[in-house]
């Protein structure tokens, strides 16, 4: 892992969290219990404070940053998809930010909301609970259904379990030169399926 103190502030990582060795945490970063931080994530706490609350995840290639005197927060069980950028915003409890989405300064994503992949949430947006946000700029399409929230929670549970699995089952290695016979397949811990397969 790459951890850097910045002007005396050292990242804080709960012992039950998993931070991938290629992720970078700088300065005023606080990571809660059971959090998963994926490969190549960059958390730059060199201006504002960055907080990932318990059970949340920040997947590979994500960026967190914010201005001075602001907190960028992912609340409990928040789910941040691959390549998303969070800048000076707040993501509510049990909300999902889809892959390659951007959430700008002062924006608030309401609890149990879903931001669709590739969406751009403008600075200052003030969301409410269980909104489905879509587009660039993002607009409220409708309320999140119970089925969608269940799907989101299964995905978040996969990442909470992945934090545990990675602490015990991830190790650096050298590649094989050919595929072994009867190569096994990995399995998740829930019955979650891609939305296209539902």
Swiss-Prot record:
Annotated stretches, region: Disordered: 179-198
Repeat among keywords: yes
Gene3D superfamilies: Hexapeptide repeat proteins
SUPFAM superfamilies assigned: Trimeric LpxA-like enzymes
GO molecular function per UniProt: transferase activity
Listed Basic and acidic residues bias regions: 180-198
GO biological process: carnitine metabolic process
Keyword Nucleotide-binding tagged: no
Alphabetical keyword list: Repeat, Transferase
Pathway: Amine and polyamine metabolism; carnitine metabolism
Record-linked InterPro entries: CaiE, Hexapep, Transf_Hexapept/Carb_Anhydrase, Trimer_LpxA-like_sf
UniProt cross-references to PANTHER family, sorted A to Z: DYNACTIN SUBUNIT P25 (PTHR13061), GAMMA CARBONIC ANHYDRASE-LIKE 1, MITOCHONDRIAL-RELATED (PTHR13061:SF29)
Protein function: Overproduction of CaiE stimulates the activity of CaiB and CaiD.
UniProt family annotation: Belongs to the transferase hexapeptide repeat family.
NCBIfam families in alphabetical order: PRK13627.1
The protein's name in its UniProt record: Carnitine operon protein CaiE
